[in-house]
Amino acid sequence: MHYLLRPLACLLLCTLLLTGCVPTDSGGVPPSQVLGTSTQTDRVAAPALKTTAWPAVPSARPAIPSTPPAAPTVVPTIPPTSTPVPAVLDLSAQAAALLPPFAADLAGAEVWDHYQISATLDPTALTVSGTQRMLVRNGADVPFAALYFHLYPNHPDFGGELSVADVRVNDQPVPVTTEQDGVLLRVDLPQPLAPGQQARVTMNFLAYTQRNASGSAYGAFNQEAGVWSLASFYPVLARYFADGWDRRPVSSRGDLAVTETALYDVTLDTPVDWQLVTTGTQVETNSPGNLPPEGYRRERFVSGPQRDFFLAAINGLNQASTDVDGTRVTVYYRPEYDAAGQRSLAIAAQSLRAFNARYGPYPLTEMEVVQAALTKFLGVEYPGVMLIEQRLYASNGRGLETTIAHEVAHQWWYSLVGNDYQGAAWLDEGLASYSQVIYYESLGDAVSAAAELQQFRNIYLSARNAGNDGVVNRPNAAFQGNYVALVYAKSALFFHALRQRMGDETFYAFLQRYYETYRYGEATGSDMLATAEATCGCDLQALYDAWITSAVPVDVP
């Protein structure tokens, strides 16, 4: 059996546990045996969602070890884009991305950074050129002398390029340098930015992707099989921790981008024969007085509070949609996979319905699933958008089902409730993996739910018996050959053990409380533990330490 766990996104890369890299008929994390193709959509009752105003749970932000800068490199000059950038972020428009009960969440907009991006897509040249304007707020308790941005496409795993030019702070040109072979951009401020103050940062950027490169590079930054995926195509402001900017070298193992919630207002010019799939929702198309060049379509998107802004352009794909609890779910797939495409819609809809009932309501108006050429991994999540490996659509096994369920769960555990995906990936991956079990329970499919749990047991026990057990709560770069077994399988089993200790009603009350407390924010393992203990009124420290912070033998549930 191949255990596929991607090092670049969220789901199963094939070289971690076995030699060779041939995606199998398995799916999810870990992949399941081929056990049929049930598309049953009846669901069992879940605990009713409580709307209790929970008391605050103590939290602490993790410290990030400092990283010495590499020799700086001045970035090249880029011509400015002709696409207009709005002068002020329209906060009222952001409500279009949120379901009405969550529009009040925008009252907290002053604590989020604001991105305004206007860009032109050229699918032939494989480039995105644009201008980014940001409103950056110093939410720390010390002045900022500089700002740091991640240029993720310059990471070797992306296989692309992202360069910037004409960087200005409050309309004043400023010096910039790059570090870590161009992956990190330093923007020196003309004067320190005091705590609580804001600065306007503008820059031009140019992104370049490869074509048909999913076998050798990151499939989510690549044009292939009718999908031009443009993950992290823009400069992303780094997070600021208690001890400074997050300047850690990015590990290839696990999710690369570690980002904070922000508001995005994005205007894109695209050739008329390409269709856009993005985070958020479209609010304008070819508005009078703001028309694009001939042969292009100009569209404006707003995100609502989101952890990232994902962009893809598609050509020649079919689509199907349905509504679930007010959210429009849309799937995109190649025409020759119509039956599987329709099945993917049923899976995504059932996943959303089940997790809404058990975790708390998804606050956004749209969710999209795209069949894509990923090759090295089976699925990857972005806020509101999920990419699924194309070969799963040709399978009659459980792979498509578990992969989509896993990625939909990430909309809660990663996108809405964030964590340090490079430093403590187990927190979102463990919950997303255990959600595969919960998904099958929502179908009343006890056989498949038990099979998922058994896969987690098999993977973890195989590693433990081989002497490869270890601490789960550690940076991705610290794992050596046991990332799958610990971050996915052992972590999923921890949440199963937690559920057994708490009981179903209290377990789901804990997850709802965790979601309510940290929605749009970031949590640590300690935050999660404190929330669980506050919900059950019990001491869970020993259970947590045994499974997560140490490598002592545990009773596998």
Explain the meaning of each model-derived region.
Residues 17-20:
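C-terminal motif of bacterial Sec signal peptides marking the signal peptidase cleavage site
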Residues 23-34, 46-49, 54-129:
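N-terminal, polar/Ser/Thr-rich
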Residues 145-173, 269-274:
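Solvent-exposed beta-hairpin/edge-strand motifs
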Residues 157-223:
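A surface-exposed beta-strand-loop module
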Residues 204-311:
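Extended, low-hydrophobicity, Ser/Thr/Pro/Gly-biased non-transmembrane segments
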Residues 266, 297-300, 317-411, 415-424, ...:
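Juxtacatalytic substrate-recognition/specificity segment
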Residues 361, 447-448, 484-557:
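Amphipathic alpha-helical substructures
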Residues 385-386, 390-391, 424-468, 540-542:
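Post-HExxH zinc-binding segment in Zn-dependent metallohydrolases
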